[in-house]
A protein has these predicted regions:
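Exported/periplasmic ABC-transporter solute-binding proteins
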Residues: 1-214
């Protein structure tokens, strides 16, 4: 809508892709970053309590490709894995799949269920006793647990501190999108969100403030 002139401002939880920059070159799309978010591999609390507290990148890839189908193959209970993916255009999916596969649009034949919003996926994982999915850190709770990532001999803990310190690999910027320089009232709104009061709201919403940084 922004690129087509139907809206003055939009939102995206990922960067504008190279293809989008080419496709909408005349629109001069620009990002205005207002926060940071971590994306974690999440599992049902029953799986977590049964011993699955960490997964390697290769194991996660194997699960989504349908090569690993039972939790017992990765140290968990003897239970079929309910693999939950997101709609392919979702920003959460883009950064997660880019890290796991090196391809933001990777197809995942092991998927049993495709969801849209983080809210929907959180509910599906919580309702199951054997699910895996991908969610923003802001959606972790007692029923939906984040596992740590193992990659090349290193363990990456899914904590806000790790994101802030640059020690967690799946991080994305939360952006406003405008076509060219924003209009005066739109710029005032963006400046507010980047300012102290707006950044307080960002933090209260479960994300990491970044102030005026782009």
């Amino acid at each position: 809508s922004v690129a087509q002139g139907h809206a003055d401002i939009g939102m995206a939880s990922r960067e504008i892709s190279p293809n989008e920059k080419i496709r909408f070159e005349k629109s001069d799309l620009r990002t205005h970053s207002v926060g940071l978010d971590g994306v974690a591999c999440m599992v049902s609390s029953e799986v977590y309590q049964a011993g699955v507290r960490q997964l390697t990148r290769r194991e996660i890839a194997g699960i989504y490709m349908g090569k690993i189908r039972n939790w017992k193959e990765v140290g968990g209970p003897d239970r079929e894995i309910v693999v939950i993916d997101k709609e392919r255009h979702r920003g959460t999916r883009h950064v997660f799949m880019q890290y796991i596969f090196g391809n933001a649009l990777q197809r995942t034949p092991g998927t049993l269920l495709v969801t849209g919003s983080n809210n929907e996926e959180q509910a599906k994982i919580a309702q199951s006793d054997s699910a895996i999915g991908m969610l923003s850190f802001a959606w972790m709770n007692e029923q939906v647990k984040a596992v740590s990532l193992q990659d090349q001999g290193k363990e990456f803990l899914p904590t806000w501190e790790a994101v802030q310190q640059g020690q967690y690999p799946i991080v994305r910027k939360l952006n406003f999108i405008t076509a060219g320089e924003p209009k005066r009232d739109i710029k005032a709104f963006i400046d507010f969100v980047k300012g102290p009061d707006g950044q307080k709201i960002v933090k209260e919403s479960g994300y990491i403030p970044i102030g005026g940084k782009d």
